[in-house]
Regions:
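Mixed-charge interfacial surface used for oligomerization/domain docking
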Residues: 2-7, 13-27, 32, 38, ...
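Class I S-adenosyl-L-methionine
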Residues: 38-100, 104-107
Length: 288
């Protein structure tokens, strides 16, 4: 198998590390961010900080990419001589992007398109794309790559510390009563995606510092006795970014068998639903 004949298509909600996007020459399908009077393209003409700066005046909506955008990207891939495509998207339980890709893919009879529903979001999904790139770079055959990626879905997890419930409530992710009660008690939820790929609150911790520590401990628990894994730190905004160095040091101490630690700002589309201050701790098990 010639690895040059396999292309990569990922969505912006997967927060694939920029270095991997460049190495794999990946095409990124952008989600949409919609305000009352204008529409932006995720990570193209709007940043996460832009979203945070405007949250007080307006909370935008997010939208999946258009079929036309996906069609154009697949046409480009085809014109570049690729025969196979690995497409990695955030959970179908959180977005219609995965289904949209599958529908559009049916039009391309000459392309062998394998679409991965990661059942995850953010870098939790992006770590699956890292694995896809790695398998292709290693020269694994097509069927083996597909099998391994399907297995990897259960091996990748991210735990989000969310500093306020306000934006999850306004975005319809949690109820108003839960939001008011949580904020009154200074409870910080730890959110992940469950096996069905939908948001699941796995803990509620009083105070931000303890909440971040809990996210780390949950990542440690998920890694278990694994012999090797990738780690990731996702952050939302400047305040969260200032905590990354300390979190990195803690992860190195508690999870020393890591192969690589990826770090990055969450996409603007994800920031819409969480607000600033989010910290995500991701793990992808490489060797159980």
């Amino acid at each position: 198998m010639n690895k040059e004949k396999i292309a990569f298509l990922v969505d912006s909600g997967s927060n694939v590390p920029e270095e991997i996007v460049k190495l794999g020459n990946m095409k990124v399908i952008p989600l949409k961010i919609i305000y009352n009077n204008e529409e932006f393209t995720d990570n193209v003409d709007i940043t996460a900080q832009d979203v945070y700066d405007r949250l007080e005046e307006e909370i935008p909506k997010t939208s999946l990419p258009s079929g036309e955008t996906i069609t154009e990207m697949l046409e480009e891939i085809q014109s570049e001589g690729f025969e196979k495509v690995i497409c990695v998207t955030i959970s179908s339980g959180l977005s219609g992007t995965n289904n949209m890709v599958r529908v559009v893919a049916e039009q391309f009879k000459d392309l062998d398109i394998f679409t991965v529903d990661t059942k995850n979001i953010g870098i939790g999904s992006g770590l699956i794309a890292v694995q896809a790139y790695t398998y292709v770079a290693e020269g694994l055959d097509w069927e083996t790559i597909k099998t391994k990626l399907e297995e990897d879905v259960a091996k990748s997890k991210i735990f989000f510390h969310v500093p306020t419930l306000e934006y999850l409530q306004k975005g319809g992710r949690i109820g108003l009563v839960a939001s008011i009660l949580g904020n009154m008690l200074n409870l910080k939820p730890i959110i992940t995606c469950n096996e069905d790929g939908v948001y699941d609150t796995v803990a509620k911790i009083r105070g931000s510092k303890k909440s971040v520590q809990k996210a780390i401990s949950l990542a440690v628990e998920f890694a278990g006795t694994a012999k090797k894994y990738h780690l990731a730190i996702a952050y939302g905004g400047k305040t969260a970014e200032s905590q990354v160095a300390g979190i990195r040091a803690e992860l190195k101490k508690q999870l020393p068998l890591f192969d690589k630690i990826y770090e990055g700002q969450i996409s603007p589309a994800l920031g819409v639903h969480t607000g600033p201050g989010l910290i995500g701790i991701g793990v992808c098990i490489l060797e159980p």
